[in-house]
Amino acid sequence: MKRDDDSGQVLLLIVAYASIALLLVTVVVGASAVHVERKQLLAVADAAALDAADAVDTDVLYGTGARPGAVPLSDRSVQAAVEDYAVAVGATGRFQDFRVEGATGSPDGRTAQVTLSARARLPLVSAVLGEYAAGVPLTVTARARTNLG
């Protein structure tokens, strides 16, 4: 019985498929980590928006008075409430490059708009994801409004 000339080719195929599988695992783990970190950042933004929606701007309240059914907010009161909340929950230490963005404020004097940004860390960095070794930039926005009865 004569042996074929293509003996040993199966090993090459196994190595190629194993490499592809490892790269696929790296990409899936990285995408999952980014998704989870984005959801955590969005949860902080939601909670900060809820907290900021109750941050009454006393200058507006006592100066011009409140409109019926609305808590008077200002960019300054929302920004201060969000920064205080972020420090209180430890968001600055939990997220890499955490920032409260300039879009944070009150666009209409009634709604608290919170925009946060951070970088998601990738647990596995390979040749495929090497471009994101410093992390993936994330930006989230949440809005909340408090209505008075």
Residue ranges and their predicted role:
Residues L50, V87, R119-R121, N147:
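Residue-level marker of positions within ordered structural domains that often coincide
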Residues D51-T115:
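Short amphipathic secondary-structure patches
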Residues D51, Q113-S117, T139-R145:
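Soluble periplasmic/extracytoplasmic beta-strand elements of cell-envelope proteins
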Residues D5-V10, F98-S106, V140-G149:
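Short secondary-structure transition/capping segments
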Residues L122-G149:
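Low-complexity, S/T/G/P-rich flexible repeat/linker segments used as non-globular hinges
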Residues M1-S77:
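Alpha-helical assembly-interface signal, strongest on the long, hydrophobic N-terminal helix that forms
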